[in-house]
Curated annotation (Swiss-Prot):
Gene name linked to the record: agrB
Provenance organism: Staphylococcus aureus (strain NCTC 8325 / PS 47)
Membrane topology: Multi-pass membrane protein
Family named by the database record: Belongs to the AgrB family.
Protein name: Accessory gene regulator protein B
Main location: membrane
One Gene Ontology term from the biological process aspect of the record: quorum sensing
Amino acid sequence: MNYFDNKIDQFATYLQKRNNLDHIQFLQVRLGMQVLAKNIGKLIVMYTIAYILNIFLFTLITNLTFYLIRRHAHGAHAPSSFWCYVESIILFILLPLVIVNFHINFLIMIILTVISLGVISVYAPAATKKKPIPVRLIKRKKYYAIIVSLTLFIITLIIKEPFAQFIQLGIIIEAITLLPIFFIKEDLK
């Protein structure tokens, strides 16, 4: 166990004793803290790289757009923590770098975003085996995913480049994670 795991265990044990948590609740609290710690670590790595490459704001805009839609639309996850790092760097560092260094035609980005809105309308919310969505929430999540995506798209029509393109990129990335091709392997297990 590393230093952070020990601290998480100590804090989870403290919470268990203080709040009379049973063993299952203790495990849930500990898992939640472990996931939070890993995600914070990934964000620190990703945003540090973005800062070094002088694209911090663009990475932030892309990532926030992605997150605002994803909290309602859900979507595919990387199979491991390592692949999550790799995918995050590709999607939120390399793709914004491509947009910064190679002017992507405004019309192409609009077309890709409109296609992405269609994908979100059809496939959101996309549950996974590890993160199922309760049936009672599906309609509401679909509605919010569409509303948030459309609102962000309308904002891109009002604001100037390059910021509009990074919002569009976030919409496109989230739409890709909803495609059924990412769930075939999971369904076969």
